[in-house]
Amino acid sequence: MQANQWQSVQNRTFTKWFNTKLSSRDLPSVFDLRKDLSDGILLIQLLEIIGDENLGRYNRNPRMRVHRLENVNKALEYIKSKGMPLTNIGPADIVDGNLKLILGLIWTLILRFTIADINEEGLTAKEGLLLWCQRKTANYHPEVDVQDFTRSWTNGLAFCALIHQHRPDLLDYNKLDKKNHRANMQLAFDIAQKSIGIPRLIEVEDVCDVDRPDERSIMTYVAEYFHAFSTLDKVETAARRVERFTEVLMSTHDMKIDYESRMKRLLGSIARMQEYWHTVQFENNYTDVKSHSNNFAKFKATEKREWVKEKIDLESLLGTIQTNLKTYQLRKYEPPAGLKIVDLERQWKDFLSEEANQSKLINTHMREIKESMRIAFADRANSFSKMLSTISNEITNLQGDWRDQLDHVEFLQEHLGPLEVELASVKVLYDNCFQAGIEENDYTMFSYEDLEHEFGITANIIANKIKYLENELLEREKRTLSKQELDGITKVFRHFEKKKSNMLNEVEFYAALASLGLVYDTEEGTALFHRAANSEEGVTYERFTEIVMEELEDRDSARQVLYAFCDVADGKSYVTSDDLLRSQVRPNIVKFLECNMNKHSEGLDYLTWIKQLLAEDKEIV
C-alpha cells in the first residue's frame, strides 16, 4: 500500500473513531479532518470527552484566524500536559489543514486514550495488544497466526476467531469457508457492530487481501475488540458471583427454617416425655415394673436414639449455617429465643436427669441385680459416653480454616479405633450382666446398644464431615489457577520485564495486567500498583502472580460481592431488575433479591443490604 493509500485509510478510520467519541454527547460529526478541526472547537470537545475533563473557556465562534489558533493551541497545550509527545506540530498546522500531521495527532490520542490501558507509549501498547490477540486466538492455530497488525488480518479469520472465542453463540467458526476472505471479514465486522457494539472503524476493502494493510488503522479497530471483550468478561464474572452469593443466601435461608422447625419439634417431644414421667404410676408387682422397664428400654432404643441423632444433626446444621455465613463474612445467625443450642442443652440436661430418675425408679423394684457387675459395667459405659460426648463437642465446636478443620476431624477419626476396642470391652460386661439376669442399672443410663448406636452416629458424623470438608477444599482447589494459566502469567511477566530485574515498573505492570485482560482506570491502576509494590521500586514476580490470582479467581468475600453488584449495576449506587436480568442472572435469583434487598428510589440498594448482612465486627475489605 502506497503512502497516499495509507493516508486515505487512516483518514477514514480516524474520522470514524473521532465520530464515535463525539456521538457519546450528541455532538456534530466530523466529515473532513482538514477543515472540521481547523477552528479547534471539535478538537477541544473530543479532549473533554476522552480526558473526562473541562478545558475551560475557549472561542466558541472563532471568526478570525487568531481565534482559531488560540483554540487549537489550548488543545495542544492540554495534550502536552498529559505527557503526550508532540513533534513538529503546531497550531498553524491544524488550522491550515495539514492532514498528515492531523492524522499523527489523532494517532497520539488513540494511543493515549484507547490503548492507554496497556501503556502510554506506543511500542509497549502494540506489544501488549498483540500478545492479547495471540493468547485469545491460540486455539485457532495454524489457520489464525497473529504476528503483526498488518498481513495477519487480511483473510478475516483473526477477527472471526476473536468473536468466536468470546461469543461462540454469535458465530460458528467451524462452518466458515476459510477461503472466502471477503465474506469472513464482512461477517465479523457485521457481528461486531450489531451484536457486540464495536464501531465499524475500517472497511473490508481496507484490509481484505491487501498486501500490507495500514497498521495504525487495524490497531485502532482491534483495540475496540479488546475493550469490548474485557468488559464482557468482567460482567459475566460479576453475574456469576452474584448468583453464587445469592444461592448461598437462599440455601442458608432454607436451612434456618428447617433448623427452627426441627428444633421446636424436638423440644416439644422431650417436654411431653418429661411430663409423662412426672405422672406415671407403678403397681407393686413384677409384671407392671417389668412392663415399665420394657417400655422404657423401647423408648431408649427408638425415640431417644432418634432424638440423639436429631440433636447431633441440629448442632451440625447450625454449624453449617454459620460456616456459610462466615464464608462471606456475614452476620452470625442467632436462633430465636428458646430455640438456641443452649436451650436444647439445658432441656437435654434436665431430660437426662429425669431419664436417670425414671431409670432409678424402675430399678428400685429390681433387687436381684448384683451390685458389683452394675458398677463395673456403669463405669465403663459412662466413661465411653463421655469420650463420645467429647468427640461430639469437638465436632460441633470446630474452628479455623477448612484445612485446619479437616486435619482435626481426621485426628478424631483416628481415635475411633481405640474406642471400638473399648466398646467391645463394654459389651463383654453388658453380656455378663445379661446372663446374670441384671436388666437395670442405677449407675448408668446407657445400655450397650445406646453406646453402639451413638458410636455409629459419631462415626457417620465424622465420615460425613470429612467428606464435606474434602469437597469444600476440592471446590476451592478448582478455583485456583491451572498450570497452563500459571505458565501464561509467567510468560506475560517475562515478556514485559524489560530490565531483567525480576521486577515490573508501573508502566510494565499496567501493560502486563492489560495483556491478561485486566484493565483499570488511572486511579484504580495506581492504587493496585502501590499495593502490589509494597514500598518497593516495582512489583516482583511473586507479588504479580498473587495479584493476578486475586483478580482472576472467584473469591468468596463481601468485597468481591460488592464489586460484582457494582459491575452489574454499571457503577450505579443501586441495581435494577433489568440490570440483573441483562447480566444473565436467573429470574428466581432476581426475584429473591427483589423481595429481600433494601429499596432505593430507582432500584435496589445493594450497598446497604450487604453492610446489613455483614457480621458486626466485619468490614468490606
Curated annotation (Swiss-Prot):
Instruction: Identify the residues that the record assigns to the EF-hand domain, covering every copy.
Output: 388-419, 487-549, 550-618
UniProt GO cellular component terms: actin filament bundle; actomyosin contractile ring; cell projection; cortical actin cytoskeleton; mitotic actomyosin contractile ring
Ranges for domain Calponin-homology (CH) come to 8-114, 123-230
Q: Where is this region: Actin-binding?
A: 86-110
Is the keyword Lipid metabolism in the record?
Answer: no
Q: Which PROSITE patterns match?
A: ACTININ_2, CH
Print the keywords alphabetically. Actin-binding, Calcium, Cytoplasm, Cytoskeleton, Repeat
Say yes or no: keyword Phosphoprotein present. no
Spell out the subcellular localization from the entry. Answer: Cytoplasm, Cytoskeleton
Q: Name one GO molecular function term.
A: actin lateral binding
Coarse class of the protein's main subcellular location: cytoplasm
- Biological-process GO terms, alphabetical: actin crosslink formation; actin cytoskeleton organization; actin filament bundle assembly; actomyosin contractile ring assembly actin filament bundle convergence
- Pfam families referenced in this protein's UniProt entry, alphabetically: CH, EFhand_Ca_insen
Family indicated by similarity: Belongs to the alpha-actinin family.
Per the entry, what this protein does is:
Binds to actin and is involved in actin-ring formation and organization. Plays a role in cytokinesis and is involved in septation.
The name this protein carries in UniProt is Alpha-actinin-like protein 1
